[in-house]
């Protein structure tokens, strides 16, 4: 009975993920209940009506989720798969449910316990893929435009089987982009900004929106983890921080170091495209700072991190995003605002804002 959806999330953030899916489902007048097991790395949402699970994964835009890394419709838990034939029961769950899917992903939750199953998942994938193709459940070749079959193992011999839609899911295995830490980067935080680019900016827009020669500002830049990503894309960067910047970045000639407080700094040039900010400060204070930059027209796009409190983390994020949205609208500014708890985030979320410049008289056009 496929009336459930499974959502992957960061271990320890199951309650936030559950609150989010419950709220978004209710907005569509779809009702059910979330099953939460702490530190499991996933949430199940069981709908009261049978067809509603499929409707949820079609109608809730995946990019609007903050805490969910992936979402899929699943059936009942398959338990005690026979060691001599694990494939047949899985295939049986999908017969009549989906046809000619474009991809198979045999996955686990992102926890230390579950990762021990990854080797088994890789081993199972090849025979399972062949069997699914034989039954026409999977297309003969991978197809990025067709649904994805998910087999989600929660324990040895126990899995959920289901599907997601490729136009409304995470394109990444386990919902996690695989990024390699560059050995010459000043800090591991560099991966947060790189992942944010992958998550928030479509690949076919990188050349236009992450273009060589753009001007950028990094508030709270030291030692330069986020500045590094901008340097790699041949931008010119104002790095704002009272601390020391990595000499390797200064040697590129692309970075100007402003020894100043990121909350007090005001730009001196008018053609800044990107603002990035990863400062350890209260979420409200950071949100107000970025909003000020957007209202003043000091930047076109911004990526920033919000450090989360110990309690009411989902509410905190929602309140800050709503506050920003309201203040921008009060100033007649259109903007796209999205937030995500990235794989490389910890007790924090990353927010992306893109200002959509109006063609009103006296306002700068969006082309610099």
From Swiss-Prot:
Source species, domain of life: Bacteria
SUPFAM superfamilies: S-adenosyl-L-methionine-dependent methyltransferases
A Gene Ontology BP annotation from the UniProt entry: methylation
Signal peptide bounds: none
Binding site for S-adenosyl-L-methionine: 189, 222-225, 241, 261, 278
Record-annotated active site: 307 (proton acceptor)
EC class: transferase
Keyword DNA repair: no
NCBIfam families hit by this protein: PRK11760.1 (NF008734)
Subunit structure: Monomer.
Protein name: Ribosomal RNA large subunit methyltransferase M
């Amino acid at each position: 009975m496929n009336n459930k959806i499974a959502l992957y999330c960061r271990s320890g953030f199951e309650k936030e993920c559950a609150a989010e899916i419950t709220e978004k489902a209710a907005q569509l007048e779809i009702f059910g209940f979330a099953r939460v097991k702490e530190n499991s790395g996933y949430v199940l949402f069981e709908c009261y009506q049978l067809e509603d699970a499929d409707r949820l994964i079609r109608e809730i835009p995946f990019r609007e989720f903050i805490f969910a890394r992936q979402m899929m419709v699943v059936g009942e838990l398959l338990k005690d798969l026979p060691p001599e034939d694990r494939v047949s029961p899985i295939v049986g769950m999908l017969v009549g449910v989906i046809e000619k899917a474009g991809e198979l992903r045999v996955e686990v939750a992102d926890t230390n316990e579950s990762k021990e199953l990854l080797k088994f998942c890789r081993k199972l994938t090849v025979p399972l893929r062949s069997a699914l193709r034989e039954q026409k459940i999977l297309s003969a070749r991978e197809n990025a435009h067709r649904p994805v079959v998910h087999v989600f193992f929660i324990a040895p011999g126990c899995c959920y089987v289901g599907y997601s839609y490729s136009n409304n899911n995470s394109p990444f295995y386990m919902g996690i982009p695989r990024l390699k830490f560059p050995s010459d980067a000043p800090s591991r935080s560099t991966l947060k900004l790189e992942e944010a680019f992958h998550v928030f900016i479509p690949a076919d827009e990188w050349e236009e929106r992450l273009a060589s020669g753009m001007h950028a500002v990094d508030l709270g830049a030291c030692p330069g983890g986020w500045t590094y990503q901008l340097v790699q894309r041949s931008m010119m960067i104002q790095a704002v921080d009272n601390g020391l910047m990595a000499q390797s970045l200064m040697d590129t000639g692309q970075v100007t170091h402003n020894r100043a407080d990121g909350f007090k700094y005001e730009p001196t040039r008018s053609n800044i495209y990107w603002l990035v900010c990863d400062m350890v400060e209260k979420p409200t204070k950071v949100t107000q700072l970025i909003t000020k930059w957007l209202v003043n027209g000091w930047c076109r796009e911004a990526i920033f991190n919000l450090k989360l409190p110990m309690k009411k983390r989902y509410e905190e994020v929602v309140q800050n995003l709503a506050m920003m949205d309201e203040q921008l609208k009060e100033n007649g500014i259109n903007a796209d605002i999205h937030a995500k708890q990235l794989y490389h985030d910890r007790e924090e979320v990353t927010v992306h804002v893109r200002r959509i410049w109006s063609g009103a008289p006296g306002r700068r056009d969006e082309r610099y």
